[in-house]
């Protein structure tokens, strides 16, 4: 048997407890865990490279920095199996990128070990990525894996891959429709449009839509500070979409500074004209009745509102997840205990990520508290939307 996901992406870190199904899988083959060897992709043994084939082995060994790629190998009386996992630092999931096995029994035994290790690490979920033409093995269905909502074909990493997830302990929640930003700078537009779509305004269609990118760029043009979307301009753009729809969606802007934002790298005229644009956005916000709440907003206040059903469009610092400091916009849409689910428009496809990494992305509240702060001195930008 060759149970396989495409040798493409990856993602990881975590919080939660293992499900009963996972426990039974681990208990039924306690010796399997003892026989599993964990190593880096650079250490692939010759016999596994031969079993995978040259092209597939090269995919296992591609550079996935900084997303913690690991290879797990099992040799047992029931057969041999190996899997590649990966995951973003400081998150609460592990992604199964590819699984090879010469028997169902070996594949199931290794999967049981991965589930147990994921739960022990504190993950909220173990994700599994599969090619569109591959089915989830029956034993994975029995263990509790369920399908992730199909994405809209958009950024690199949204095509050719299906996603499945096992929530340790279970987590019932609505999934947002995933759309990956198609430029380096449209994260704010995509985050806002994703949130509004979930509330019924459908800036993105329910099905693949060849006009989606045009709407992404149009929304960005209405909000941009060239090229980033700063909180005031983004709030104005969101307000205008809501107003045009005559819907009952509420918007609330929290930005705990009155100084210009996201201009840390600009000087001279490059900074001056962007400051002027932000002043125009501020005036437009006032003319529309958008109040800027400048009181500091705690992470507890954010997560409590998300837990109650609101969506939070968050300005974050990406460094904890990507080992590089960059401002970014994401949507927080569900909370369970001390874990928050994010919808992240960004996919680092060149390092093996796909939409499976960025959709329903669990992080701890403590890590989110660090991320929802950008600049020096730091400021916190949050736009709440809800019906």
Give short role names for the model-derived ranges.
Residues 91-144:
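Acyl-donor binding region in acyl/amide transferases
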Residues 118, 122-123, 128, 133-139, ...:
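Noncatalytic regulatory segments and standalone regulatory/sensor domains
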Residues 167-228, 233-242:
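Active-site nucleophile-adjacent alpha helix/oxyanion-hole segment immediately C-terminal to the catalytic cysteine
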Residues 63-112:
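Conserved donor-binding loop and adjoining core beta-sheet/short helix segment
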Residues 270-341:
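Active-site-adjacent substructure of cysteine-protease-like catalytic cores
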Residues 1-13, 27-61:
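Short amphipathic alpha-helix that is part of the acyltransferase structural core
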Residues 258:
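Active-site acidic/histidine clusters and adjacent loop/turn architecture
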Residues 146-160:
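Conserved catalytic-core motifs of GNAT/GCN5-like acyltransferases
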């Amino acid at each position: 048997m060759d149970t396989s996901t495409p040798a493409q992406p990856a993602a990881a870190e975590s919080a939660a407890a293992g499900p009963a199904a996972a426990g039974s899988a681990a208990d039924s083959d306690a010796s399997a865990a003892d026989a599993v060897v964990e190593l880096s992709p650079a250490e692939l043994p010759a016999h596994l490279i031969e079993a995978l084939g040259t092209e597939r082995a090269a995919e296992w060994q591609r550079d996935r920095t900084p997303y913690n790629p690991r290879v797990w190998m099992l040799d047992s009386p029931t057969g041999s199996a190996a899997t590649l996992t990966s995951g973003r630092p400081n998150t609460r999931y592990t992604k199964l990128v590819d699984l090879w096995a010469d028997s169902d029994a070996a594949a199931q035994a290794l999967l049981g070990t991965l589930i147990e290790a994921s739960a022990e690490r504190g993950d909220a979920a173990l994700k599994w990525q599969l090619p569109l033409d591959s089915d989830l093995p029956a034993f994975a269905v029995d263990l509790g894996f369920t399908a992730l909502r199909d994405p809209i074909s958009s950024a690199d990493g949204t095509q050719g891959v299906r996603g499945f997830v096992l929530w340790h302990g279970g987590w019932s929640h609505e999934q947002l429709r995933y759309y990956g930003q198609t430029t380096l700078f449209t994260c704010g537009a995509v985050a806002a449009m994703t949130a509004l779509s979930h509330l019924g305004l459908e800036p993105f269609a329910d099905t693949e839509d060849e006009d989606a990118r045009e709407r992404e760029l149009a929304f960005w043009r209405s909000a941009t500070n060239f090229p980033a979307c700063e909180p005031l301009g983004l709030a104005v753009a969101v307000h205008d979409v809501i107003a045009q729809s005559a819907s009952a969606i509420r918007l609330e802007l929290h930005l705990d500074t009155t100084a210009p934002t996201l201009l840390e790298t600009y000087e001279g005229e490059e900074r001056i004209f962007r400051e002027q644009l932000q002043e125009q956005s501020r005036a437009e916000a006032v003319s529309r009745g958008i109040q800027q709440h400048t009181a500091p907003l705690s992470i507890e206040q954010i997560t409590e509102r998300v837990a109650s059903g609101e969506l939070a469009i968050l300005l974050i610092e990406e460094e904890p997840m990507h080992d590089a400091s960059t401002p970014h916009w994401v949507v927080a849409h569900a909370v369970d205990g001390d874990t928050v689910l994010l919808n992240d428009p960004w996919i680092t496809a060149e390092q093996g990520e796909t939409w499976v990494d960025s959709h329903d992305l669990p992080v701890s509240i403590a890590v989110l508290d660090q991320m929802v702060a950008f600049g020096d001195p730091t400021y916190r930008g949050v736009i709440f939307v809800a019906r």
